Amino acid sequence: MLAIGVVIFFGFLDNFTGNIVFLGGTIYGVIFALTVRFYAIPYGGVISGYSRIPSNLFDASKSLGYSTISTSYKITLPLIRTSIIAAAILTFVDIVKELPMTLILRPFNFETLATYTYQFAHDELMIEASFPAFFIVIIGLIPILLLQNQLNSFFHSKN
């Protein structure tokens, strides 16, 4: 449904600009749609990490003369680094599996593992479909295992 909305938006944009900017069937259209679709995952993860930072750290930083940008780089970023990494991993795994928007919005001759799997399965070539499907599983599994390892080491270090 979101892919259809993106197609309509880009069609309106193309008509409004007199077809100067054609984004509907380009990689930019796919990137825009994936950004809109998966924005909630990293946003929620980063906000969750940011909300755990006590506000008195920012007050102490200002009283010590640090600017807002300096505080962001020296205090905020190191404290929410794990939240950013976890959000990036979860977003990456979801993007690798995404088929509907990629199938609708992709440019001609632009294939992903999900579109290869879909095409082979649609043609009932299950053996050929198993290879890209297996890679989707492996590509999705490795970051999740790394994230699980990080979480286990984090929770065991607290005990």
Model-derived segments and spans:
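Hydrophobic/aromatic residues in alpha-helical transmembrane segments
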Residues: 2-6, 42, 46, 88, ...
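Membrane-interfacial helix termini and adjacent extracytoplasmic/periplasmic loops
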Residues: 1-35, 69, 105-109
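Hydrophobic transmembrane alpha-helices of multi-pass small-molecule transporters
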Residues: 41, 82, 140-144
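Membrane-embedded alpha-helices of multi-pass transport/permease systems
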Residues: 29, 36-58, 96, 100
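Hydrophobic transmembrane alpha-helices
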Residues: 28-40, 89-96, 106-108, 135-140
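C-terminal transmembrane helix and the adjacent membrane-cytosol boundary/short C-terminal tail
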Residues: 47-77, 89-90, 130-159
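Residues that define the loop-to-transmembrane-helix transition and helix capping
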Residues: 27-28, 58, 69, 81, ...
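Interhelical loop and adjacent transmembrane-helix boundary motif
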Residues: 96, 102-145, 152
